[in-house]
Amino acid sequence: MAVDQLSDIVQRCQTIQDDLYTPEDYDLFQCAARKCIEEGDSVHVLSIIVDEKNKHIVRCMGWNLVGPLVLVLLKNEENSVSPSRAIFSHLLEICSPKELLVSLLEQVEAAEPDVIRDTVMFLLQPLQKVLLNFGRKKATFLGMTLSTLLNQIARLPQEDTAGLGQCCSGLLCFVKPFVEEAKDTRNSGVAHDEELRTEMLKFCMMSLRDPLLGLQFTDPDQQDKSFLCEFATEILAILSGIGESLPELLCHELLKKHEVPGFLEEEVRYPKESLANLAYLLFVHHIAMETFPVVLSPVFILQCNMEHIELLLSRYDLYEKSLVRVEDNSLSVELLEIKTFISVPQNLVKVMTLCPVHRLRSKGLAVFQLSINKFNTEGKYKFLRCMLKTSHHSGVEGVIIKNIKNQVDLSLRPGNKNVWFQGIHFLPLLRLVLSLPQGPETDLLQNLDRIMESLNLLRYLLIRDKESDNETGVWLELQAFNDSFMTPLRLDLNMSKAHYQAELSNAGCDSESVCTVSVGNENLPNLTPEVQIQALHSALFTFELIESVLVRIEEIIEAKP
């Protein structure tokens, strides 16, 4: 019988002096007591545990019973006055805090995903009680505990929002006494107090990364006061409470400190992902925005946010929210010397061209256009030139060339003359626009957007900028443009039309033919003859559209005096 075995081992241990118990004693005590608990004999175990004669035995060995007790309490959902719960509470009072903490954290780490919520919620209060028993030397153990809890909460199934909400709320209650202590002692200059403040900072940074970085709120402009919003609000409040300035954290990359007190290296203390999400919470969801000073200029805030935007580009709401605060035509060209002012739009182009979700591609295009609008004239010139060289996508190149046309149109209006979209500076940009990516062998269908916008720009220049004025310089370079752009384009058009007309004839003669198309080494469904013919007609119509604009340009040139 387990009860008899437990009584025997306890009686034998009572005779041992100075708590010199052997590993075998520990094993026998744990096995017998666990079996009693599992078999429902918790009353007998409780009587042994609370017996004053066994106090030293329980203090040394009792922590081994935490695991079995937690499993029983979670499984059986026993009431608050049950023997098992009484045993658990008594162990928390008399056992070594360090050994209890290890045992409790083992239970947290061992929890399977389907019981993480129940395990975490049950153990938060015992863990808090044990940590408070460490006194002023709790910081390291608190950090270990918070890291374990957050790692387990991150393993919750994504669909378990209720469980995540409970755990986040419970976690805030758990850290409350430690936060208050860190607030009260933040200027004490004592090493233990600084370590506690550092652990609270680590907790906030970890929380900003997970769960807050991996989860979406509701609509940024119409969000409910959800548990996630409340959790984020409290995390930012803790940061402020322990002496971390939110504006300084936001501008951390720009105003990086070289000497940081404490034992953490800077990149560990202030992870980039956490700081990026801090900016996202501030400027997209307006959490704790009332603490942010209004004296900081929108341009400075944008500059601070660019590092964060680069990390969070899939959520380019932060880019948009940072840009809308900036006045149009106000960003100086010097900002383009900062790497992120080029890399962020380049990455945004990837979203615009590669993202499978139409809504996100459209939103990306709108933000890209917004970024163009914010630069001054010289900034627009250099930004558009850089993007035209690096985008390598006809649709994006078409958007860029259309923006160039709009800037030229603006510069030709009375009172808006500038040196960047006229004359000597404009001609190199125009040469870049009026070129075929692969010369006469360029795929006209694949490059349709770029080619049509290039032709529209050239036609506009020839009509709007009279040869007698020649403000843009286009008339001086006309022969060069004819040789490098229009003649190769005409040759390309003739070859493409001949090829597709031949294909159309073949398709009409062989009505039984089936066309197979492969993409990425995978065959797509075969095209029927009717679909083939329709596609060929569509291509020929596109060539006629290109040719009509090209002919109009040639007519304008021929009609010059």
Task: Kindly give the residue locations of the regions a language model identified.
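Hydrophobic residues within the alpha-helices of tandem HEAT/HEAT-like
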Residues: 88-91, 123-131, 171-179, 320-325, ...
